[in-house]
Amino acid sequence: MKRHTAVWVASLALLAHLTSAYAAQEVRATRLGQNPLITVDTSLTLGGNVNGPTVIRVPDWVDRPLGRYYMYFANHLGEFIRLAYADSITGPWRVYEPGVLHVRDTAFYRPQPDPKETLADFYTHVASPEVLVDPDRKRLVMWVHGWSTNGERWPNDPVKALAWARQAGYGQFTQAAESTDGIHFEVRPPITKLSYLRVFQHDGYFWGVSRLGQLSRSKDPLASFEVGPNPFRDGPYANRVRHVGLVVRGSRLHVFFTAIGDAPERVLMSTIDLTSDWTTWRASPPIEVLQPEMRYECADMAVTLSEAGDVDVPVRQIRDPFVFEEQGQASLFYSTCGEQGVAGARMTIR
């Protein structure tokens, strides 16, 4: 019996080793030598917080672009979406200080100022930009999130504010906007009741993966997304997925993500088989892609459990992965030291 047990354990160990070796070959990230690309000190307009990068190659039909590449990002408590531009993804990146898409022009605005008593959980902001380049209609579609309360001001008391929001069905939701130049955006009325939306196209739909790993979909990128199942349900990262980056390879979706409660928070990757009905989609056990190892990622700080929400001091965490692909080359962008900057890495996905 002991011999059979030993053989079984050895077999499991071999399987784990082979699985680990395969995973290591599947995704490899090599940091850019120019890191960090942006920090909170890059511009006074950044307000001490940088997170949620999204990078695009500026389309040829945009007149007089600021640069070849645009990076949209946010201050977690910010009043507008930030924009940086460069002629190479390695930089140098320069901040377009006026920014784009102010919160006052979205559904996430209300009479100001916000009550000081509620600022820990309730604050007027616009963040987590996701951008789709639509070459057929020569437009950019941007999705952003913020507190949606139908323009109403919440109660001054934090406990009453939370109860009020729950009773009214309010929350941090998503709205879409359009632009022909990447700088001037016009919002569209529909609201999707999810936040941190990332989008990919497949089988005639625009599919979304949002905070906590929640799925959604729509035929029209400007419409409200239908909320569906969660492929991370019943797994080790159920209700922990923070922000995702998405890559489609045929009928396989690669989901890069970081998780609330990890120590340290780091970039992981799971895959989802898209061939079946979306109600049956499941995320595979994740592999590690990148964790804080460099000084600009605060690797010299103590390891602590990450928490939900914003973080206004440097911490040993990397967050908010985004994958940009151009001419067969994938690049991973991510937030450093929690929410103190943006760095990048070249990446191979097999």
PLM segments and residue spans:
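Bacterial N-terminal signal peptides
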Residues: 9-17
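Bacterial N-terminal signal peptides that target proteins for export
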Residues: 1-9
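Short, surface-exposed beta-strand/loop micro-motifs that present aromatic residues
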Residues: 321-323
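Beta-rich carbohydrate-recognition and catalytic domains
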Residues: 22-128, 132-243, 247-314, 325-350
